[in-house]
């Protein structure tokens, strides 16, 4: 750019074009590969789930969540890879806006969940009860629920009585499981032999009487309390989700403005070459079709 216009050069001009380009290529490629990996794992998990599932519902299926997440990451990251390789302003702007929208939506979702904390907890508890109804028919939910109940020493969603929603654990049901809870709710030492009937006839007990046999606290509150007690892990998790997206938006913005500066430099140079050269207005709309710099 001519010296007389140097004061108009944006701050991003201090960044090397090649440094920004290769940084964005590496950033996009890494998440493109991660998205492909997540998508592959999700497809494989869903194929395995289809072999053994007895329900048509995809409720709380981790495979479905992985597939959706993988598709979004794969497509968005591919746009970033293509845009950074081609220096295509339209694709670069689309990539930046998509990342920005995702980031804003996640922040808004988190804020709304905090503001309406009670409603969020009720929503989670209702969905857990729906899963409990099909506990023995949905292997994915069963594995997740068993892991959470053992890991966080809890039982059910709101509390242990949620297990009455299951047809086998309802107190009016026939069979040995009636009015009981799964053994993963039981209080036991790691050295004890697993007693799968340890939760026998506990749903109809009062909390004070049941708390010496099973974990009476619900898993929703148990998980929330664990996150609050381990706030460093929570902060690290949030940073791990939000920071890469923010860096992607910032890096893309810097690269877009750097490419625009180069386009402007070329336009000014072409204008000095003679009347037959393309002016800035002639090249202003070509950012979606052409690659810069030549």
Curated annotation (Swiss-Prot):
Pfam families: Tetraspanin (PF00335). Keywords: Cell membrane, Disulfide bond, Endosome, Glycoprotein, Membrane, Transmembrane, Transmembrane helix. SUPFAM superfamilies: Tetraspanin (SSF48652). Palmitoylated. One of its GO terms (biological process) is protein localization to plasma membrane. CDD domains: penumbra_like_LEL. Belongs to the tetraspanin (TM4SF) family. This is Tetraspanin-15. It comes from Mus musculus (Mouse). The lineage of its organism: Eukaryota, Metazoa, Chordata, Craniata, Vertebrata. The gene is Tspan15.
């Amino acid at each position: 750019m001519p010296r007389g216009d140097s004061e108009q050069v944006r701050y991003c001009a201090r960044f090397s074009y090649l440094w920004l380009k290769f940084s964005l290529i590496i950033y996009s490629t890494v998440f493109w590969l991660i998205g492909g990996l997540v998508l592959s794992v999700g497809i494989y998990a869903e194929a395995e789930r289809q072999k053994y599932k007895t329900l048509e519902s995809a409720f709380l299926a981790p495979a479905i969540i992985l597939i959706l997440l993988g598709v979004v990451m794969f497509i968005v990251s591919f746009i970033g890879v293509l845009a950074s390789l081609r220096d295509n302003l339209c694709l670069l702007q689309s990539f930046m806006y998509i990342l920005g929208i995702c980031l804003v939506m996640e922040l808004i979702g988190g804020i709304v969940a905090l503001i309406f904390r009670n409603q969020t907890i009720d929503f989670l508890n209702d969905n857990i009860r729906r899963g409990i109804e099909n506990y023995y028919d949905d292997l994915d939910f069963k594995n997740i629920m068993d892991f959470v109940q053992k890991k966080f020493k809890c039982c059910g969603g709101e509390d242990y009585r949620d297990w009455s929603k299951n047809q086998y654990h309802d107190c009016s049901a026939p069979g040995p499981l009636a009015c009981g809870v799964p053994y993963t709710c039981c209080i036991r030492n790691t050295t004890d032999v697993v007693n799968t009937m340890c939760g026998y006839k506990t749903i109809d007990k009062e909390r004070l009487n049941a708390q010496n046999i099973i974990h009476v606290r619900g898993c929703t509150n148990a998980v929330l309390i664990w996150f609050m007690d381990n706030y460093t892990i929570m902060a690290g998790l949030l940073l791990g989700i939000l920071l890469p997206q923010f860096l992607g938006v910032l890096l893309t913005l810097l690269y877009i403005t750097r490419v625009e500066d180069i386009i402007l430099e070329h336009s000014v140079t072409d204008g000095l070459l003679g009347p037959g050269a393309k002016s800035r207005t002639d090249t202003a709309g070509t950012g979606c079709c052409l690659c810069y710099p030549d």
